[in-house]
Amino acid sequence: MVSMILAAAFWVVLHFVAAGPLRPRVAARLGEQGFRGVFSLLSAAGLAWLILAYRVAPYVTLWQAVPGAAYIAMPLMFVAFLLLAFGIGAGNPTLAGADMLLKDQLPIRGITRITRHPALWAFALWALAHLLANGDLAGVLLFGAILVTALNGMVSIDRKRHRALGQGWEAFAAQTSRLPFAAILAGRNTLHVEELPPWRAAVGTALFALALWLHGVIGVSPIPS
């Protein structure tokens, strides 16, 4: 369990440091591309450590499984995969390296109308779904670490973009929201379903089906019985 605790701590500290006041100084020495490269390598190593430590960690019960958790986790997982499919590569200035999208025009369309952080919400919902279904210490460390860094990532990205882009970011943020559907419900934007490509919905659904199949392969079925 020591390795699991250290892996979770490394993951959280890495992401908080990368989003904190040390980032500009490190990026100044390595260059922005160099910083992103090092951070990506460390993140990959941290994720591998988390997974390997989780697989060998002893099962320590913290609480019994939440009654009906599977009925909550399944829809959360489906939404998470849809957000991931719609968010990745969809032209969002909150993604790494996409700052220049705000230079020409506000890219407020599609999933960005719903939330400006679709991919991070995908990871957050994925982690939350697994927290509901797992009440053991190793599960809480793994999924809790991912949930915390995903939620903190939204805040830190917004702050970084605001510092870098100023009024361009303020105009973008005024018409979008961190919380899904908040800008639409507040009347700051409108939902246009026709801007959500059906093929992305198909990809999200396929990923969800693949995840269900993989759970069966490892002997852990998420389907309510």
Residue ranges of predicted features:
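A contiguous pocket-lining binding segment that forms or flanks enzyme active sites
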Residues: 112-167
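Juxtamembrane boundary at the C-terminal end of a transmembrane helix
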Residues: 210-225
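Loop-to-transmembrane boundary segments
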Residues: 107-119, 183-205
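Portal/gating segments that form or line small-molecule/metal binding sites
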Residues: 41-112, 116
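Hydrophobic transmembrane alpha-helical segments in integral membrane proteins
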Residues: 1-13
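Membrane-interface helix-loop junction between the first two transmembrane segments
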Residues: 16-35
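Membrane-water interface of transmembrane alpha-helices
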Residues: 14-20, 82-97, 156-164, 170-171
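Membrane-proximal soluble regions of multi-pass membrane proteins
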Residues: 159-196
